Amino acid sequence: MISTVALFWGLCVVCIINMARYFSSLRALLVVLRGCDPLLYQYVDGGGFFTSHGQPNKQVRLVWYIYAQRYRDHHDEEFIRRCERVRRQFILTSALCGLVVISLIALLIWH
Protein backbone atom coordinates (compact mmCIF):
# COMPACT_ATOMS: atom_id res chain seq x y z
CA MET A 1 0.00 0.00 0.00
CA ILE A 2 1.24 3.51 -0.81
CA SER A 3 1.81 5.79 2.13
CA THR A 4 -0.38 8.89 2.11
CA VAL A 5 2.52 10.98 3.37
CA ALA A 6 4.72 9.79 0.49
CA LEU A 7 1.90 10.57 -1.92
CA PHE A 8 1.57 14.05 -0.42
CA TRP A 9 5.31 14.74 -0.79
CA GLY A 10 5.20 13.46 -4.36
CA LEU A 11 2.39 15.90 -5.08
CA CYS A 12 4.46 18.70 -3.51
CA VAL A 13 7.43 17.85 -5.74
CA VAL A 14 5.22 17.89 -8.85
CA CYS A 15 3.81 21.25 -7.78
CA ILE A 16 7.28 22.73 -7.26
CA ILE A 17 8.46 21.46 -10.65
CA ASN A 18 5.43 23.03 -12.34
CA MET A 19 6.05 26.31 -10.52
CA ALA A 20 9.62 26.32 -11.84
CA ARG A 21 8.32 25.65 -15.36
CA TYR A 22 5.81 28.50 -14.98
CA PHE A 23 8.47 31.00 -13.86
CA SER A 24 10.78 29.88 -16.66
CA SER A 25 8.01 30.38 -19.23
CA LEU A 26 7.19 33.77 -17.74
CA ARG A 27 10.83 34.79 -18.02
CA ALA A 28 10.91 33.67 -21.68
CA LEU A 29 7.69 35.62 -22.30
CA LEU A 30 9.31 38.77 -20.94
CA VAL A 31 12.30 38.30 -23.27
CA VAL A 32 9.97 38.01 -26.27
CA LEU A 33 7.94 40.97 -25.00
CA ARG A 34 11.05 43.15 -24.77
CA GLY A 35 11.71 42.60 -28.47
CA CYS A 36 8.21 42.81 -29.89
CA ASP A 37 6.47 45.41 -27.68
CA PRO A 38 8.83 47.64 -25.65
CA LEU A 39 5.99 49.84 -24.37
CA LEU A 40 4.11 46.91 -22.86
CA TYR A 41 7.43 45.64 -21.49
CA GLN A 42 7.89 48.91 -19.60
CA TYR A 43 4.21 48.98 -18.60
CA VAL A 44 4.57 45.65 -16.76
CA ASP A 45 8.06 46.47 -15.41
CA GLY A 46 9.76 43.75 -17.46
CA GLY A 47 13.27 44.77 -16.42
CA GLY A 48 12.53 44.58 -12.69
CA PHE A 49 9.97 41.79 -12.79
CA PHE A 50 12.02 39.15 -10.97
CA THR A 51 14.01 41.50 -8.75
CA SER A 52 13.51 42.43 -5.13
CA HIS A 53 12.74 46.02 -6.11
CA GLY A 54 10.10 44.99 -8.66
CA GLN A 55 6.75 46.76 -8.52
CA PRO A 56 3.98 44.30 -7.60
CA ASN A 57 1.20 46.45 -9.06
CA LYS A 58 2.92 46.36 -12.46
CA GLN A 59 3.46 42.61 -12.15
CA VAL A 60 -0.24 42.14 -11.45
CA ARG A 61 -0.94 44.08 -14.66
CA LEU A 62 0.78 41.36 -16.67
CA VAL A 63 -1.15 38.65 -14.84
CA TRP A 64 -4.46 40.37 -15.61
CA TYR A 65 -3.35 41.04 -19.20
CA ILE A 66 -2.81 37.31 -19.68
CA TYR A 67 -5.84 36.25 -17.60
CA ALA A 68 -8.19 38.49 -19.62
CA GLN A 69 -6.60 37.17 -22.85
CA ARG A 70 -5.95 40.69 -24.15
CA TYR A 71 -2.89 39.33 -25.94
CA ARG A 72 -5.09 37.81 -28.66
CA ASP A 73 -5.13 41.14 -30.52
CA HIS A 74 -1.34 41.39 -30.50
CA HIS A 75 0.54 41.46 -33.82
CA ASP A 76 3.30 38.99 -32.89
CA GLU A 77 2.41 35.29 -33.17
CA GLU A 78 5.33 34.21 -30.97
CA PHE A 79 4.11 36.47 -28.18
CA ILE A 80 0.56 35.09 -28.47
CA ARG A 81 1.87 31.52 -28.30
CA ARG A 82 3.98 32.27 -25.24
CA CYS A 83 1.06 33.99 -23.49
CA GLU A 84 -1.15 30.97 -24.13
CA ARG A 85 1.51 28.69 -22.68
CA VAL A 86 1.99 30.87 -19.58
CA ARG A 87 -1.78 31.03 -19.08
CA ARG A 88 -2.15 27.23 -19.26
CA GLN A 89 0.78 26.70 -16.90
CA PHE A 90 -0.62 29.25 -14.45
CA ILE A 91 -3.97 27.44 -14.38
CA LEU A 92 -2.23 24.07 -13.90
CA THR A 93 0.06 25.37 -11.16
CA SER A 94 -2.83 27.06 -9.36
CA ALA A 95 -4.84 23.85 -9.44
CA LEU A 96 -1.87 21.83 -8.15
CA CYS A 97 -1.23 24.30 -5.32
CA GLY A 98 -4.90 24.10 -4.37
CA LEU A 99 -4.67 20.32 -4.38
CA VAL A 100 -1.58 20.46 -2.15
CA VAL A 101 -3.43 22.66 0.36
CA ILE A 102 -6.48 20.38 0.35
CA SER A 103 -4.20 17.33 0.76
CA LEU A 104 -2.40 18.97 3.65
CA ILE A 105 -5.69 19.70 5.41
CA ALA A 106 -6.81 16.11 4.81
CA LEU A 107 -3.53 14.78 6.21
CA LEU A 108 -3.88 16.94 9.31
CA ILE A 109 -7.42 15.68 9.88
CA TRP A 110 -6.71 11.98 9.30
CA HIS A 111 -3.33 11.67 11.01
From Swiss-Prot:
Tagged with keyword Transmembrane:
yes
Keywords associated with the record: Cell inner membrane, Cell membrane, Membrane, Transmembrane, Transmembrane helix
The membrane topology of this protein is: Multi-pass membrane protein
Bilayer-crossing residues are 1-21, 90-110
Q: Does the keyword Transport apply?
A: no
Pfam families for the chain: UspB
This entry carries the following GO cellular component terms, namely: plasma membrane
Q: Which InterPro entries does the record match to this protein? A: Universal_stress_protein_B (IPR019598)
Query: Where's it found, cell-wise?
Result: Cell inner membrane
* Family designation: Belongs to the universal stress protein B family.
Q: What is this protein called?
A: Universal stress protein B
